[in-house]
A protein has these predicted regions:
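Metal-dependent phosphohydrolase cores
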Residues: 1-137
């Protein structure tokens, strides 16, 4: 998926936003706050996946609208919930020294990077709407 084609914000693509986060991640590593290569790789994956749920047609229409449009809870699923469906478990498993819980850790970081909703409750109660939103991709 070419994330340069999708917008995270009106003035920034998802890929540009990811690149910004990765720059900050490098700063944290350089400063010694991330001293484990495994942790660095897990956070890097979380940075990559955290906003991919914004690729939906509804989000893209909203972010590019000339006049401010608000999130429609009847039609949309928060992007942090949708993003977790894109996390690739195989990528997590490729990390040297990975732990079987690492996939869940990355998913948790992605799901809870905003507090728009209770992600688990949303997943359990809005499965049909999640499928509709993901079908737009």
């Amino acid at each position: 998926m070419n994330l340069e084609r999708y917008w995270a914000k009106p003035d920034k693509t998802i890929q540009q936003h990811i690149n910004d986060l990765l720059t900050h991640l490098e700063t944290l590593k350089t400063m010694g706050y991330i001293d484990s290569d495994d942790l660095y790789e897990l956070v890097k994956l979380a940075c990559y996946y955290h906003d991919i749920g914004k690729v939906t047609e509804r989000f893209q229409q909203r972010v590019l609208a000339k006049e401010k449009q608000y999130f429609d809870p009847d039609r949309e699923i928060p992007h942090n919930v949708l993003s977790v469906y894109f996390v690739n478990e195989n990528q997590v498993q490729k990390i040297k020294g990975h732990d079987k819980r690492d996939y869940a850790r990355v998913c948790f970081a992605v799901m809870y990077h905003h507090d728009y909703c209770d992600p688990i409750k949303t997943i359990l109660e809005r499965e049909d709407r999640i499928k509709e939103n993901l079908a737009e991709v």
